[in-house]
Amino acid sequence: SLIGREIGGRLSMGGHTDDATIHEVVIGNDVLAVSANRIRYPEQRRDGVAGRLDLYALWPDMQGFSEENRLAFNNADASKVLIFLSFEPRSLSRDMSGRLAPIYSQMLKGSGELLPNGLTRHELPADAGFVDESILVGQRNDGTKFVARCLIPGAEQSAAAGCDRDIHVGDDLAMMARFPSSLLDDWKTLDLALSAFAAQTVKTMTP
């Protein structure tokens, strides 16, 4: 039957879709416009009001799922990298970069370890609730800080995405990005790409 073929097709996709239809999702006062093949969960692929939106995209072009890149989206192509992103109402008054001075810096000891990629790594204290975690800090061209939180070396192999970074976008949204630490080799490109993707996705960006 037609219905049976449609359901079978969905199952063969493994929960992914190659449908590029744009959905408009409203979270609070913000409107997000996203293609269905970038939306991670089938139940979120609809227009309307939501409390959260979860996305995934192929680095570096931020493409959604297609038959051509099926292996990458099924974690079966080690040469391709997925970034996972979530949008939800802000729960903190500052994003990760904004938390560096008032929060993270109060926990850090010493000057940290300067890495070849230009970032400085600081281990976060376990007694503050951080287990096998560090923050990596970089200086942007405008003098502001790039901050990411990562699993420390040796623990990373247990996680598909070893680092995360959140930024404030729109009127009242936070975008959390999760990605492998290998992308920090060119962290400035990553930083710009995440901001550009947010600007493209959130249609109520604060001037």
Located regions from the model:
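Short acidic-hydrophobic surface loop/beta-edge motif
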Residues: 22-27, 136-138, 168
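Short, surface-exposed coil-to-beta transition loops
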Residues: 68, 131-132, 158-163
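Long, compositionally biased interface segments
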Residues: 158-207
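A mature extracytoplasmic/lumenal domain signature
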Residues: 38, 151-154, 179-181
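Glycine-centered tight beta-turn/hairpin loop motif at sheet-sheet or coil-to-beta transitions
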Residues: 27-31, 143, 172
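N-terminal Sec/ER secretory leader and immediately downstream segment
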Residues: 2-92
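Short, flexible beta-strand-to-coil junctions
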Residues: 60-62, 88-90, 140-142, 179-183
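Non-cytosolic head/periplasmic domains of membrane-anchored proteins
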Residues: 71-153
